[in-house]
């Protein structure tokens, strides 16, 4: 099968698998799963970074989209790839909350953090996160909108990687992360479902200040991407809200899962 045909088939599979389970629902009151030394067994576990809050920032908190984004992405990863994903005996994904200063951080191939416009890194966070990323870890930050949130985040990540040493770049279209499983031309603009409904189908949550999606990154000395920043989009909402509205699902969730599969395959192969 030609690559384009394979990609089209995979897109249909994403839609078909999810449609078969549309609205399946999960218990959002599930107790938080804090990472422990015995939480890791060689399988993939979605790790959500727990960060300190900046009172002068812009956005929600590290709990945004929890736990459904973590659950749904773990399930789709198991369905759409051959990756071994951790599930418990009742069949729930073993997604984990990981404090940035915990030793468990180093057992996570990837850390996901949402709404980082309100994040604050302490000196201890900075030292630990820098060590984790330079040793092969990966950080994906998502769902922060507009120039104020960007500047707040840029100030914090500069503590970890001063831009003169490790510059932030706009990822070029030929970067491998856009081509690992699906051929992506760009990161799509995905709004939170509440904004999308309330605005009558709008996608830019900060108007003209967030009209353009940015896919930015920080790489190590060997060119390995260590930090992915998807700015002016809410990719994780496309996972969390996949069962709420079929129109939102077909418009945004299929693309959101394509982005996620590409990122995760890049992480696990680099």
Model features per residue range: what roles?
Residues 20-110, 116-117, 234-270:
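Aromatic-Pro/Gly-enriched surface loop or interdomain linker
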Residues 26-28, 41, 54-57, 150-241, ...:
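An acidic, glycine-rich "communication" segment
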Residues 1-9:
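Bacterial N-terminal signal peptides that target proteins for export
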Residues 68, 72, 76, 124, ...:
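Extracytoplasmic/secreted proteins, especially bacterial periplasmic and envelope-associated proteins
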Residues 83-98, 141-146, 165-174:
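Surface-exposed patches in mature extracellular/periplasmic domains of secreted proteins
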Residues 15-17:
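N-terminal signal peptide c-region/cleavage motif recognized by signal peptidases
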Residues 46, 105-151:
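Short alpha-beta junction capping motif
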Residues 37-42, 102-107, 132-134, 162, ...:
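Extracellular/periplasmic catalytic domains that process cell-envelope and extracellular macromolecules
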